[in-house]
Design a protein with these regions (language model features):
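Conserved helix-turn-beta segment immediately C-terminal to the redox Cys motif
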Residues: 28, 55-60
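N-terminal signal peptide c-region/cleavage motif recognized by signal peptidases
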Residues: 19-21
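Sequence/structural segment immediately N-terminal to covalent heme-attachment motifs in c-type
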Residues: 23-40
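Domain-level signature for proteins that mediate thiol-based redox and metal-cofactor handling
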Residues: 35, 59, 63-64
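Short hydrophobic/aromatic patches at helix-to-coil boundaries
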Residues: 101-105
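Bacterial N-terminal signal peptides that target proteins for export
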Residues: 1-10
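Axial heme c-ligation environment in periplasmic c-type cytochrome domains
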Residues: 36, 45-56, 69-98
Length: 105
């Protein structure tokens, strides 16, 4: 019985540790106002992050391209509504956000 509780506790702890970075990146997206136009799984004003991840899967320049778009904004890729620039996001935060987004396939 103690072994079962120990194993169960270990699995729960491992799950929480694995979820922590994802939650931290979601929090960063919220703090950076990204969630005003994007959601993880549904189109809002801009594309869902899952759609972005699918579109850029296998693109070796995706991290660089999307990190630049987070900072400078962009237009024409997902329709007529432009993505505004977000100068308040630091370059390392943009990279962190994009790595997270690309992991959401």
């Amino acid at each position: 019985m103690k072994l079962i509780k120990l194993v169960t506790s270990a699995f729960i702890a491992a799950g929480l540790l694995a979820a922590a970075p994802a939650m931290a990146n979601l929090d960063l997206a919220k703090k950076s106002n990204c969630m005003s136009c994007h959601t993880v799984d549904k189109k809002l004003v801009g594309p869902s992050y899952q759609d972005v991840a699918k579109k850029y899967a296998g693109n070796k320049d995706a991290l660089k391209t999307l990190s630049a778009k987070v900072k400078a904004g962009g237009k024409g890729v997902w329709g007529e509504i432009p993505m505004p620039p977000n100068a308040a996001v630091k370059p390392e935060e943009a990279t962190k956000l994009v790595k997270w987004i690309l992991s959401l396939k």
